[in-house]
UniProtKB/Swiss-Prot annotation:
The keyword Transmembrane applies. It comes from Stutzerimonas stutzeri (strain A1501) (Pseudomonas stutzeri). It is an enzyme of class 3 (hydrolase). The keyword Acyltransferase does not apply. The gene is htpX. This is Protease HtpX. The active site is at E143. Its cofactor is Zn(2+). GO terms for molecular function: metalloendopeptidase activity; zinc ion binding.
Amino acid sequence: MMRIFLFLATNLAVLVIASITLKLLGVDRYTGQNYGSLLVFCAVFGFAGSLISLFISKWMAKMSTRTEIISQPRTRHEQWLLQTVEQLSREAGIKMPEVGIFPAYEANAFATGWNRNDALVAVSQGLLERFSPDEVRAVLAHEIGHVANGDMVTLALIQGVVNTFVMFFARIFGNFVDKAILKNEDGHGIGYFVATIFAELVLGILASIIVMWFSRKREYRADEAGAQLAGTSAMIGALQRLRAEQGLPVHMPDSLKAFGINGSLKHGMAGLFMTHPSLEDRIEALRQRG
């Protein structure tokens, strides 16, 4: 998922904007007096950004990738794509999602939507042109696995929890700086405001490590689902083809890379912020699974 990721940046922006708004309205001076009410208050704002993003995810995905939804197939490839997704969805026990193709040379695909029965699965033009039918089917099975596992909803809920505690502990830190260090006894001063914003940025980046860890775990689960639906050898073959094309630039919007099959490759500390495990690790996990 992401290069210091639009998804993370969006959530941090929500927190910062919320903090500025609360300061300007003077609300913080009341919520900061009681930790119980503060936690509830932060939960409302913390979940707002992630849940709004979840509910508009299909619309945003279509707009940002210029995905063309297949309503009436015009070619045999589109007909095959619809039939394959329909078959995989039926086997996974979910409602047929919308199916689309987005114009990109790199081989990639993504799934999104606010619930498992109102989803979108889209593949890149490059994937359809260069991958074999078995490999494309395995990629589609992986994305159907994301939908069937409810990964989009779970990720949004985890992000909401993370946002809540980032806002909560940032305000506790801001209050400590304002009262204990700056000795401000007259409401919340500028020290509280600056310290809170600083803490939100730092804690938000640290907390994103938790979100990225979960994202990597769910990739393994989606690979397992793909192997169950399309066969282990086909799933491994698709991942090997993706590995062969790993040097190609990825043009998918950062907000959707978390839900694509092919993630960015990072090493060292940057690996903590990867949305996907390495393709080598994913292939090895499938081989061990048998």
